[in-house]
Amino acid sequence: MAKTPGPISLIEPLSGNSALLVKINAVYVVKRSRYQEIVVADTEDFGRALILDDYIQSSYYDEVYYHESLVHPAMSTHPSPADVLILGGGEGATLREVLKHRTVKRAVMVDIDGDVVEVARRYLPQMHQGAFDDPRAQVVIEDGFVYVERALAAGDKFDVVIMDLTDPYSSDIAKQLYAPGFFKKVRGLLREDGLVVTQAGNSFFFPEAYDMVLHGVRSSFPTVAEYSVWIPSFGYAVNYILGSLKYNPTALTPEEVDRRLRERGVQTHFYSGRTHLGLMSLPIHRKIRRV
């Protein structure tokens, strides 16, 4: 595997006024796809990382915090998730976590950028861990908006929809998938007891974008839970918003979460019943402005 030696530095934007300086020791690939610049590099503090348009999307040393927190609260809240739709998640780690649940019969991953998927297959094996080749997995290279409309027209149904997209403010690719009207479409794809979960960027640096996503979920789902997890390679806490048509994720006890994980054969590094309780109990972060 060819690589360009470092060290060099990545200036990763946190907001329009702040940034994270990341030391890069080696670069494996730099590629411009139709939609974005794709970089895979070895970083000093975070290990190998997938970087899209100067934003770290996933890194070996901390991606489990992001992906386990995105996937398992919703999957554990549903008593028997069989059909799961993933929008985004090109590196395959979200798919990997979904497929840990023995209840899953079908996991459809839809990503607009096939180049990201191919780069991940070759350069990020620890991310996907063979998930792309699982017989339950179906990888579709298509705009998520188009796929959802097509699935709606076909009458397809899912138990859980997981939105692992780029931030609503970092690029134009995914913006329409965060709009209130899109969450209404997602609701139409779900069975009567279905759930959706989306990452929603950061509520501290980008409160307006976060509130837009929150409004979209609340407009279509009767039960909504907000939670966040600190991701070191991002330099901030990532926010998640979970919408449910029937089950309340905040009502699950740690014992019930652990029982469901155990019965489904799910092994995790970070997420557990105790973690679930913590995620659902702590407030999100916003700027506290004092005069």
From Swiss-Prot:
GO terms for molecular function: spermidine synthase activity; thermospermine synthase activity. Gene3D superfamilies: Spermidine synthase, tetramerisation domain, Vaccinia Virus protein VP39. One of its GO terms (biological process) is spermidine biosynthetic process. Keywords: Cytoplasm, Polyamine biosynthesis, Spermidine biosynthesis, Transferase. It is found in: Cytoplasm. It is an enzyme of class 2 (transferase). Its EC number is 2.5.1.16. GO terms for cellular component: cytoplasm. Residues 5-245 form the PABS domain. Pfam families: Spermine_synt_N (PF17284), Spermine_synth (PF01564). Signal peptide: none annotated. It catalyses: S-adenosyl 3-(methylsulfanyl)propylamine + putrescine = S-methyl-5'-thioadenosine + spermidine + H(+). The active site is at residue 164. Its main location: cytoplasm. Pathway: Amine and polyamine biosynthesis; spermidine biosynthesis; spermidine from putrescine: step 1/1. S-methyl-5'-thioadenosine binds at residues 36, 111, 143-144. InterPro entries: PABS, PABS_CS, SAM-dependent_MTases_sf, Spermi_synthase, Spermidine_synt_N, Spermidine_synt_N_sf. Spermidine binds at residues 67, 91. Belongs to the spermidine/spermine synthase family. Catalyzes the irreversible transfer of a propylamine group from the amino donor S-adenosylmethioninamine (decarboxy-AdoMet) to putrescine (1,4-diaminobutane) to yield spermidine. Homodimer or homotetramer. This is Polyamine aminopropyltransferase. It comes from Pyrobaculum neutrophilum (strain DSM 2338 / JCM 9278 / NBRC 100436 / V24Sta) (Thermoproteus neutrophilus).
